[in-house]
Amino acid sequence: ENFAGGCATGFLRTADGRCKPTF
């Protein structure tokens, strides 16, 4: 699965390009 941020499921891409968990 590829998302816009390239992060794993349950993670969001932040403005600085990192992935952070949404929980």
From Swiss-Prot:
UniProt superkingdom: Eukaryota
Source organism of this protein record: Manduca sexta
Bridged cysteine pairs (disulfide): C7-C19
InterPro entries, per the entry: GBP_PSP (IPR003463)
GO cellular component: extracellular space
Transmembrane segments: none
Organism ancestry: Eukaryota, Metazoa, Ecdysozoa, Arthropoda, Hexapoda
Claim: Cytoplasm is one of the keywords in the record: no
Name of the protein: Paralytic peptide 2
UniProt similarity note: Belongs to the GBP/PSP1/paralytic peptide family.
Keyword field contains Disulfide bond: yes
UniProt note on tissues of expression: Hemolymph.
Role this protein plays: Causes rapid, rigid paralysis when injected into Lepidopteran larvae. The physiological role may be to reduce hemolymph loss following injury and promote wound healing.
One GO MF term: cytokine activity
Record's keyword terms, sorted: Cytokine, Disulfide bond
